[in-house]
C-alpha cells in the first residue's frame, strides 16, 4: 500500500506540473463540500476557493477520497485544511498505513504570490500556480501580451535563497519584539504584521524542472 501511495502522489504532482490549466477550473460542488469543512465564519477566509476545488478535483481523479479529521482511513484519502482555516497546510494526503504528505497551495493571476505572515515550511510540498506574461511574444497590433499558466512543484526548503531566508528571519525577530512591546499598554491594541510577497520570477523552466526532480526524490 505504501508503494502505491507514493506512486500515486508522484503521479499527482507530475500531472499538475504538466497541466497547469487544470488548476484554473470551476467545480462548485467540490467547492461547496470543502467549504463545509471550514466552519461557520462568514469571511472569505472561511470558504474554499476555486483554486482549492480544482486541486481537490485532481486529487480525487488520482484515486484519493475526501475524509474529515478523525475519520477512519481505509483507502488513499485526503483531508482539507487539517489544521483549520487560515493556517498552513491546505491538503494532507494520507494512506491506511499512516503515511502522510502535507501540501500548501499558492495561487496568483500575476507573477507574485502573497506570504503575508507565513513562510515556506520544511518538508511541505508547495503547489504554486501563477500566470506569466510573455512580453517577448506580444503580437504587433494586439494590446495584450500572451499569458502562460505555470505550476511549480517544490519543497518548502528548496524555495528561498539563503539571503532571503536570513532577511525574513530578521524581520520575524523584530516583529516579536514589537508585539512584546505592544503588550505593555493600557487601552491601545497594536498589531505588527507582515504583508510579504514573493516573486514568481524565480520559478524559471530550469528551476521548475529541478524542484520537481527533488520532490520526486523526496517521495521515493
Feature roles, as predicted:
Residues 1-89, 93-101, 107-220:
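Nucleic-acid endonuclease domains
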